[in-house]
Amino acid sequence: MRTKIEALFISDVHLGARGVNAEKLIEVLKEYDPEYLFLIGDIIDGWLLKKRFYWQQTYTNVVRKILSYSKNGVKVIYIAGNHDEFLREFLGVDLGNIEIHNEYVYKNIFISHGDLYDGVVKLKWLGLLGSIGYDFAIYIDRKLKKIGFKRSLSKFLKNKVKEAIKFITSFEKQLVHQAKKRNCDTVICGHIHHPENKIIDNIKYLNCGDWIENNSYIIYQDGEFKIHYK
């Protein structure tokens, strides 16, 4: 029997990239019976799919499971991110039980992928360069792990791409500021692949993480948020 919860939050699956832990995500989707499913951006990696098409059957199975949620009455809210920004052409469109938004407020919770407040991603050409390099690094990581190399090249590369821009941005504070502007006391985002649950300036800040390295997600039930790892 699936566990009933009020809301399930997932971000940064990156279907279309190598190394996505799709099987584990499917297990999570089978485990819970939420009233709401919030997909907080970069579920599909449109950037990489434009460059070269990489798709596995398990990726299709993830999409099918999300559609089955919608068919069975779960309200699916899809927040577009920078890697699936093509969906921003369909903002506000209601596809049955699936809605597409740029950002969303649920109760007192501000929900955003977060790319709109990241100075690096605003320079799209550099973000694309980083994405391609990151995808390649994930492939190299998998090879290195087989021979016992533990350090993550993909994490190192992602940090270096961010540092390459001589522009310091406080991602978390930006999101907290946006939550305050909307009179919300909580913000949930993704984008930076860093799961987090903490208080910043009296605002609860949560980040879903990702499904390449952390396999993390957030559940909301009885007024409480919890980050889980698969």
Predicted regions and their residues:
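Active-site-proximal loop/helix segment associated with metal-binding centers of metalloenzymes
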Residues: S112-F171
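Short active-site segment of divalent metal-dependent hydrolases/proteases
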Residues: L15, I44-D45, L116, H194
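Active-site neighborhood of phospho(di)ester-bond hydrolases with catalytic His/Asp-centered motifs
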Residues: I10-S11, L37-G41, K75-N82, I111-S112, ...
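Short, basic, glycine/proline-bearing loop/turn elements
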Residues: E6-H14, L48-R52, F156-A164
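Core catalytic region of metal-dependent phosphoesterases/phosphodiesterases
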Residues: T3-I5, A17-Y106
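Conserved beta-sheet core of the metallophosphoesterase superfamily
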Residues: G96-H101, Y106-K107, D115, V120-G127, ...
